[in-house]
Amino acid sequence: GKDQDEVDTALELIKEKKLRGIIFLGGDFRKNKERIAKIKVPFVVSTAAFDKLPEKCIASYVSIDDRTESRKIVDHLCETGHKKIAILASDKKDENIGKLRLEGYREALKAHGLEVDEERICYLDEEDTTYSMENGYRMMKKLLKKETEFTAVFAISDLMVIGACKALLEEGKRIPEDVAVAGFDGLD
């Protein structure tokens, strides 16, 4: 069905087709921990990371080190002179990629002796957790409205950074002269 997610589809296929294994190519598994535990065949998740998988899961994942790569991006912003760096982060309940990327941001600031100002962290709404241009735009508008000072912004997704750029340009900000922007994902 339309509202069916990756885990629902997998559980259905296991039952119908008697699968012996599954490979997930991405997906959003944040709200599915209890249902993930019901998958009784080995599975691999590509391009998604888990901080913790349910016990007794026969699972592996293939992903980059989101924490380290985020830290490298924020390190670069710090090394180019930025001391007030905002982040467009995932929702507060995210325990996967978004959490790891936020941890990398925090680690980089601390490593450069900079304070982590919670006012510069803009979280996705829990109702709509997609890393989209629309959400990046909305989040940047929200950050600008707070009048929190920042010279750079790191978005945890390239799609979000595109939306953020649109919001910055609408407010008359020049990129990178007024605000440097950096995104994550390697979008072409």
What are these regions (language model features)?
Residues 9-15, 21, 33, 37-188:
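Bacterial carbohydrate/catabolite-sensing allosteric modules
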Residues 2-4, 24-30, 159:
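Short beta->alpha connector loops
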Residues 1-6, 118:
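Conserved nucleotide-sugar donor-binding subdomain of glycosyltransferases
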